[in-house]
Every structure is written in structure tokens, then in C-alpha cells.
């Protein structure tokens, strides 16, 4: 049995008519891309293929735009917009709607969520943008037609350090690896990322990193901001103990890590 589109999907379909009614032709130069577009990466080869198709057959599905200043802002159809630019079109079919910032962002997000190649990081950042506009996780879940737990789990990815998010976006680690890193303490996540990348760990092996760390003595307090910053800089777990006087404890787990640390600190054996 076919399933009806849920959440915002019905709203996007309603705004893009199946017939020519309500569709106008606009100069492509009058349309500006949406700076809040949830999707940041587009496959170049796929864009070229779409541009070739547009040159041959034209742009068949209209863009969704809203008036802004002396022109228009793109709401939905970023991939088609970019391909139209590559194809050298002067005019494009479009549907013009007056939309608030929230409505525009919601529609841009749902269009991207309907694509299978949206990255986990882009999805999480899209949800985060909706939260920053005042929606709760429950409201976000209802609008995109997903369970609240799905939204919450996606948002947890944003707790990872930037290096891990970049590795996930580049395809160097999978979402499973990212979830395994979230099982580690914040100050251990960069070390975990390094282990995964350098040793080519599987998701199951990455999940075992927590058990490996569990054998170490338990820390009695949450890491300080300075400890986290030093951990990020050195790529190893660091603890700063004390106030005006104290000690800095750098934890390494192999001779290779120690040698790399010494080189980073400028020590020549």
C-alpha cells in the first residue's frame, strides 16, 4: 500500500503545481541562492549531467522562490538552479510565494530530506536551524514526518568535534563510526577519530574503543574547557589538574602516539 507524504512533504507538493498554472518565467540572474540552504555539497558530475539534460529539454520542474529586495530568493530547487546556471539559461520557470524565514527554511529542508544523498551532517544542521528558529524537537519531528528519536539522534552528531564532522562529510568515516565516537568522552573523541582513520577500523572495532578506555582509571570530574582545548590541539586526551599550580596530564596509548606528540612539541630525539 502506498504511503502518503507526511509532514512538510504535502506542503511542498501543494506549492509546486503539476500544471502550468501559477508558473512564471524569471530572469535567472534575478534569483539569489538561499544562504540558509541545509545542503552544502553537490556532486559535480551529477550537476553536469543535469545541466546537459536541461540544455536538451529545458528545465521541466519550476523553482520555488520568494520575493526579496529587488529580486527573488531561492526556496526549493537548489540543484536545478545550479544546473541551470551551468547550462547557461537566461530564464527559468518559477513559482513565486510570499514565505516567512521559517517557512522558507522548512520547505528547503524537506526538499533535501526527500533526497537519499543528503549527508547525516547536513540533515543534523537542518534540524538545528529549525530549533534555532524556536521550534522544539517534537515540532521539528512532526514537520518532517519523522520520529522525535530520529531527530534527536541526528542532532547528537553535532556534539562531535569539527574534524569528525568534516571526515563524515568527506566520506572518510560512516554514520556508524560517528555514533561510535559519541560513545566516548568528549576529550577522547579526537583520539578515537585518529584511531579509526589511521587503522581503518570497522564500526564494530570503533565501538570497542569505549571498552578499551573503560579499563583506564575513572576520572573524578568533568574535563575543563582548557582540557578540551588542549585535547583538540594535541589530538590526545589531556587533563589539567589544579588551579594556579597543578599539572598537565597527556595520555598516550602507543609508542607511535608518544613519538608524534614529541615531534609536535618540537622535541628532537
Curated annotation (Swiss-Prot):
What protein name applies here?
Answer: Chromosome-partitioning protein Spo0J
Q: Where is this region: Required for DNA-binding?
A: 223-269
Q: Keyword Cell division on this protein?
A: no
InterPro entries reported for this sequence: Chromosome_partition/occlusion, HTH_ParB/Spo0J, ParB/RepB/Spo0J, ParB/Sulfiredoxin_dom, ParB/Sulfiredoxin_sf, ParB_dimer_C
Q: What does this protein do?
A: Probably involved in chromosome partitioning. Binds to a plasmid centromere-like site parS. Stimulates the ATPase activity 10-fold of Soj; the first 20 residues may be responsible.
Q: Which GO terms describe its cellular component?
A: chromosome
Supply the source organism for this entry. Thermus thermophilus (strain ATCC BAA-163 / DSM 7039 / HB27)
The ranges of region (Stimulates ATPase activity of Soj by 8%) come to 1-20
State the NCBIfam families in the record: parB_part
| Biological-process GO terms, alphabetical | chromosome segregation; positive regulation of sporulation resulting in formation of a cellular spore
The encoding gene:
spo0C
Amino acid at each position: 500500500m502506498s504511503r502518503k507524504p507526511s509532514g512538510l512533504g504535502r506542503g511542498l507538493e501543494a506549492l509546486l503545481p503539476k500544471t502550468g498554472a501559477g508558473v512564471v518565467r524569471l530572469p535567472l540572474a534575478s534569483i539569489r541562492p538561499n544562504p540558509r540552504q541545509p545542503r552544502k555539497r553537490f556532486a559535480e558530475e551529477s550537476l553536469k549531467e543535469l545541466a546537459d539534460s536541461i540544455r536538451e529539454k529545458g528545465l521541466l520542474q519550476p523553482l520555488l522562490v520568494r520575493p526579496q529586495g529587488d529580486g527573488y530568493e531561492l526556496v526549493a530547487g537548489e540543484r536545478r538552479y545550479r544546473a541551470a546556471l551551468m547550462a547557461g539559461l537566461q530564464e527559468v520557470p518559477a513559482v513565486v510565494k510570499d514565505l516567512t524565514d521559517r517557512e522558507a527554511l522548512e520547505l528547503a529542508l524537506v526538499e533535501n530530506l526527500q533526497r537519499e544523498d543528503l549527508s547525516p551532517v547536513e540533515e543534523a544542521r537542518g534540524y538545528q536551524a529549525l530549533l534555532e528558529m524556536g521550534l522544539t524537537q517534537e515540532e521539528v519531528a512532526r514537520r518532517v514526518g519523522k520520529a522525535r528519536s530520529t531527530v534527536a539522534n541526528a542532532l547528537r552528531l553535532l556534539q562531535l568535534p569539527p574534524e569528525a564532522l568534516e571526515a563524515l562529510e568527506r566520506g572518510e568515516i560512516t554514520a556508524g563510526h560517528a555514533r561510535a565516537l559519541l560513545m566516548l568522552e568528549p576529550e577522547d573523541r579526537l583520539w578515537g577519530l585518529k584511531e579509526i582513520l589511521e587503522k581503518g577500523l570497522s564500526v564494530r572495532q570503533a565501538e570497542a574503543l569505549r571498552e578499551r578506555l573503560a579499563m583506564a582509571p575513572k576520572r573524578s570530574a568533568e574535563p575543563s574547557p582548557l582540557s578540551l582545548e588542549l585535547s583538540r590541539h594535541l589530538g590526545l586526551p589531556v587533563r589539567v589538574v589544579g588551579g594556579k599550580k597543578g599539572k598537565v596530564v597527556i595520555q598516550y596509548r602507543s609508542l607511535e602516539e608518544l613519538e608524534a606528540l614529541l615531534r609536535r612539541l618540537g622535541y628532537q630525539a
